[in-house]
Amino acid sequence: MFAKLETYPAALLELVATANDAAKAIPPLFPLSSSVAVNPFLGQTEEPLAVTAARLARVGGTKIMPERAHWAAKLEAGDITETDLTEALAALKGRFNCPSLDDVKAALTVPSPTPQALPTVAELAADVSGLDWPALIEDRISAWAAGHFDEGQALWQQAKTGGTFSAWRDFAARDLTPEIQGLSGFCAFVAATNRSHWRAIGRASERLNLGTEAASTAFHRWLMTLGGWAQYGRYLLWQDELNGAQNSTVTELLAIRMVFDEALFALYEDQISARWAEVVAAHQTPVTPTPDLVIDAIWQDAAERAEQRRLAETLQSGAVQPVEGRAEVQAAFCIDVRSEVFRRALEAQDRQIETLGFAGFFGLASAHKAAGSDVVETRGPVLLQAGVSSQAKEAEELDLDRRYSARAKRAWGRFKLAAVSSFAFVEASGPLYAGELIRDSLLLGGKTKAEPAPALDPSISLATRIQMAKTVLTAMSLTSDFAKLVVLAGHGADVTNSPHESALQCGACGGHAGDVNARLLAALLNDRDVQKGLRDQGIEIPSDTVFLPALHHTTTDEVTLYEQDLSSYALQISEATRGKLKGWLTEAGRLARAERAQRLPRASSEASVHMRARDWAETRPEWGLAGCRAFVAAPRARTSGADLGGQAFLHNYVWQRDEGFGVLELILTAPVVVASWISLQYYGSTVAPAQFGGGNKLLHNVVGGIGVLEGNTGAPRAGLPWQSVHDGDKVQHDPLRLSVVIEAPREAMSEILSRHPGVRALFDNGWLHLIAMDDEGKLAWRYRGDLKWSRFDAPQSTPSALAAE
């Protein structure tokens, strides 16, 4: 990503730094095989919503807050009160020129203005020529990029030596399409560019009269026109930065885009130079929100405060006493909001059932190889590097069978895509799929054989395993009072014929199901040598406690128990409890499906919920995390009696057991951040689907194994498809920024935020809300930013409510 600084003049070095900053303003697009939720505002977390709204209006013509009719409806329904509005208005004072309360309310009668991005040279040239130059540029870059970035879908791979810009330069110098469309001499123009993409950026900037101040948002603007290609380049940069390496793909793509505009400027300079000078002058001005954007930000904050009031009431009415004595079953689920519905249903089966919430990778981020495969899957959060390696091993004969089957499947896939056979494939082979289609539609298919148990490979020392087990149990607030049976339930989704399948899997497991992580941890905790080591460190696991790995299928609310992983002794001592558990899980699944069916279109029966997982044409097999709005880290007793509607991330946390607040620090810096990415992806895909959404599933075509096109051309679409947030009648996700509720001392949270400026920025700039719960389970304190707090129930305009830490 970084240039060799000693080889460039000072003026170019300033542009290099600006280009690198622009690259980081773009969110990453993870490939379909390991797709995870990404915060579309990742590069803007250092500024508040209103400023980001102004920035994205300038560089993308993007509106990132709901229409005012949305808030007007909430106000009329009583969901937003005048108190909410007054507090939101008071909270914004000092940052911007704030309007009066009357002005804020009056604004609802007028639609907010539609933002217009500053035009590129290509758009100005299109205006004077009548030729759609932006579309041509998108088409030619996409035609090249689809092959250049291909991850195995294409039969013929492009050469990738020399870097992204160099590869495009070789392609474009021979691509006659722009010249045929009227961009005369373009091939020669490209051939004359320097092979250094930094030199190309420098030359184009000079030719277009771009100084450093104007380049900041101008570079961002050009990258926005590249859509998913720039975002995939940002993913490559993200991955290399995790490994301490460098990557210049995004800035090389910027150079490619600028070369097009440089060539167009040379062709149309006489007609557009005056207008382009105005654009450059506009890029030089500071990014400042308009009064309309400030008003919209106030309404957004008011809606979130209203939701926090309702959350406080729900939690107060739902608090229950914890299980007395030893629980018969403890079931640990991922904090994913989909688990909340099932946990509530399971706890309703018997008072001796206790559920826990923890990040779905269960503290073991693993670089994993499935049985019969050499492909390494990162089964952990994208924020972390894998801490261990694992592999699912089986007998050599079975391993070879899997490999031969996989090769045959790949060969069949290549036959489908080959230049000649692809034309006749549907007519010749379509009938072969009829049986499979009928079988799946009637739910007659057999269950997929479970993977063999994963094991750490290479193995690690006993001392390391003991420390790992202690760390995980401490983070789960599970260091005493173990039940007879402790279920460790990862989660995964069962969907058919969906390019976005990995987006419904466990985000904490890198877009994979959580079965591997659950099975690894269960094996670790069932190890008698590990238990002895834990006992020496003060964690006593009873001799009759068994850890049972499981997988919660979120599409069907069924649970797979990996009993085959247990020893004969563990099977024997847990037989009676496992028998009860299976009955409880069956009934809990029935209740959970009935609750979820109320939101799902055409889900009138329990069978129809199952059918969605196997239906090849189903665009909404489940709602995923649509509706997520809160994150609660507290003892389960604070939430177990509350119906949170499958809209809250629930993390077990007992601060009194957290010596030094290391677990609290982990929660704030890892699962809270991951949850914010999820929440803001749903937010962005709902309020700005054209920019941050994945488009219409019915029009999707996979490109390069990276992402999807909407149609057969253009750039990959990032974010969630429209069907993932909209039921055909109304949106299923209320665009609210996440409210994080933690039962812990404010001083400890402030101290942690002071050590992590990136996390603090999320709260200081309002991308997340932070609320402290007191020891009675009440929402007591609200984080105000700048390490200051105010009482949750106090009007925000009351100075005496402030408490600096």
UniProtKB/Swiss-Prot annotation:
GO molecular function: zinc ion binding
Membrane topology per record: Peripheral membrane protein
Segment forming the signal sequence: none
One cellular component term from this protein's GO annotations in UniProt: plasma membrane
Record keywords, A-Z: Cell inner membrane, Cell membrane, Membrane, Metal-binding, Transport, Zinc
Domain of life: Bacteria
Cofactor: Zn(2+)
InterPro entries, per database record: DabA
Endoplasmic reticulum recorded as keyword: no
Subunit organization: Forms a complex with DabB.
HAMAP family, per the entry: DabA (MF_01871)
Family of this protein: Belongs to the inorganic carbon transporter (TC 9.A.2) DabA family.
Protein's recorded name: Probable inorganic carbon transporter subunit DabA
Organism per entry: Ruegeria sp. (strain TM1040)
